[in-house]
Regions:
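Alpha-helical membrane-spanning segments of integral membrane proteins, especially the hydrophobic core
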Residues: 126-139, 165-192, 212-225
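Cytosolic juxtamembrane amphipathic/interface segments immediately preceding
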Residues: 51-64, 165
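Membrane-interface helix starts
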Residues: 58-74, 175-180, 261-272
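Hydrophobic transmembrane alpha-helix segments characteristic of membrane transport
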Residues: 144-173
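Hydrophobic alpha-helical transmembrane segments of multi-pass membrane transport/permease proteins
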Residues: 67-96, 140, 144, 184-196, ...
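Membrane-interfacial helix-loop-helix connectors in multipass membrane proteins
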Residues: 198-220, 290-308
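Transmembrane alpha-helical segments in integral membrane proteins
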Residues: 131-155, 234, 319-335
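Juxtamembrane transition segments at transmembrane-helix termini in multipass membrane proteins
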Residues: 2-50, 56, 77-78, 93-125, ...
Length: 343
């Protein structure tokens, strides 16, 4: 009997593998690089309109405005204490480059536009004077703010009235699992980092000096970013699912992958709309702040050293984080409310 024991184990393993494969095909019937006819992948997804859903998220936050404003203010204070406030000179440089790029765009000088965008991303991603330890702590606090927002909204949707301290004390249990998913998202963004490196290298040798070359590279960059966002759709929803009690990272990725099957593009449109609203809010608020800052400092030179714009940027960062967390969580609730199975 011992001679046949390895064969029995092999047959059991083969049967279990076949069952897992059949279950996987039932959950996700569509294969990559194989054509699926439209009639075979129709999966319902009933969502409100873009403006209607944005208003829904706004009202959900406004009903508990004291709690969420306090949460955003807390993150802004932590960012300021850790020194994650970009210098006033950097924002002034960005402002000047943006003004120059607006005029240059009409003349086909796309390099000025990309330089302004790259400078803004660099200024927000790695503020001057922030140590690596402080950056890690900022990421950890940012994940905690994400989890706290999800926890508070989940409690509010259940009919309870939680306080901010309840969320801060209770939402941190899946912090390590959330950090694992954040690392997965960072890996998925590696192609974007490679595009930025390619842009820096090609610009240094002068290959992107002409308008046509810059335009082609810009189209390539937009394509890469779109594919990355399409790829990250499941990961973004997994960052919400991981907040459920007893959830593990791989299981959250599995559930999120099942949720977005047949709906990925429509969910991606909603995420792009979220990004558009945040960008417009940043342009509006920081534009008004820079104008007001310049006017006040011309009237009262004594306040010329007051970093008004950097602190407003810290506030906008915290508000954007809370808004994004709420938007994605409520979007997730709308998606799972339509429990249609994959076609």
């Amino acid at each position: 009997m011992k001679r046949f024991h390895p064969w029995l184990r092999f047959l059991v393993w083969k049967d279990s593998l076949s069952i897992r494969n059949a279950t996987f095909l039932q959950r996700r019937p569509h294969r990559s690089f194989k054509r699926t006819r439209r009639r075979d992948y129709a999966r319902s997804l009933k969502l409100p309109g873009y403006w209607s859903f944005t208003a829904y998220v706004w009202l959900a936050l406004w009903r508990s405005k004291k709690t969420f404003i306090s949460l955003a203010a807390l993150y802004a204070v932590v960012a300021a204490v850790l020194g994650a406030v970009t210098s006033q000179a950097t924002y002034q440089e960005i402002n000047n480059m943006v003004k120059d790029s607006v005029g240059a765009a009409s003349q086909g000088a796309w390099d000025a536009i990309f330089q302004s965008a790259a400078l803004l991303v660099t200024a927000l991603a790695s503020p001057e004077g922030v140590s690596p330890e402080a950056q890690v702590l900022l990421v950890v606090v940012g994940l905690l703010v994400w989890l706290t927002t999800v926890w508070l909204l989940r409690d509010i949707m259940a009919g309870r009235k939680p306080k901010l301290r309840d969320g801060l004390y209770s939402a941190g249990s899946p912090l390590v699992a959330t950090a694992v998913l954040a690392f997965v998202a960072a890996l998925q963004m590696v192609p974007f980092a490679l595009v930025m490196l390619a842009f820096a290298g090609l610009s240094a040798v002068g290959l992107l000096g002409e308008g046509l070359a810059m335009m082609l590279f810009g189209l390539f960059a937009v394509l890469i970013v779109t594919l990355i966002l399409y790829w990250m759709t499941a990961t973004i929803l997994a960052l919400v699912i991981i907040a459920l009690p007893g959830m593990y990272p791989l299981r959250a990725m599995k559930i999120a992958g099942d949720v977005v099957v047949g709906r990925r593009l429509r969910i991606l449109y909603r995420l792009l709309w979220l990004g558009l609203t945040i960008v417009l809010a940043w342009v509006l608020v920081l534009g008004l702040t820079v104008t007001l800052d310049s006017g006040l400092k011309n009237l009262w030179p004594a306040i010329s050293g007051l970093p008004i714009v950097p602190f407003m940027a810290a506030v906008m960062s915290s508000v954007s984080l809370v808004w994004s967390s709420a938007y994605i969580y409520l979007l997730y609730r709308k998606v799972i409310a339509d429990d249609a199975s994959p076609a």
